[in-house]
Amino acid sequence: MNILIVDNNDSFSYNLKHYVEQFSVEVKVIRGNKLDLNCIDEFDKIILSPGPGLPSEHPILLQTLDKVIGNKSILGICLGHECIYTYFGGNIKICSEIMHGKTSNMKHNGDKLFNKIPNPFCAMRYHSLVGDTDNVPDVIEIISETSNNIIMGIKHKKYDIYGLQFHPESIGTNFGKQLLKNFLLTTEISS
């Protein structure tokens, strides 16, 4: 299996690569500003990494989604998650509490992405933006939230597309490796 990590200038991108490589897959990291959309076909799954800024400041991520929806499995983390949420019509807003290097308990709905992960579990957060719950797109299902109902995980109802606001690649996230493994297996695990 060939995995593409689109690196959005984030220091965690190589932590992500290191974790994913542990599952006997080929992983290539390409900076978003260097990504040639014509090369995407050679990859089985795509991970949109964390990074600074707003989704609108990363048009390559939105172009990537345009090209691969329905053909590739996608996992967006932090910025990648926010891009997926806005791509399908959701709005993002500034967090009431900025979460940089803070952990929170995450509850989940038992989706296959959370296979073998306790409910709740502790995860590391580095973000100042969140998905607005006032306009969740019809095609999006919320699969994880904090105890005060801040969106932490989403999936597309039809396609193999997931987003996580928290950081599974952080050592501060319990079961982060299991989450990434579950993403690699998403087409093989039944819900």
Name every feature range the model reports, one short phrase each.
Residues 7-8:
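Acidic di-acidic motifs
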Residues 17-25:
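Two-component/phosphorelay signaling modules centered on CheY-like receiver
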Residues 26-34:
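A short beta-strand-loop structural module common to alpha/beta enzyme folds
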Residues 34-43:
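Short amphipathic alpha-helix with an adjacent loop that forms part of the alpha/beta core around
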Residues 112-158:
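Catalytic beta-strand/loop cores that center a nucleophilic Ser/Cys/Thr
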Residues 168-191:
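Acyltransferase
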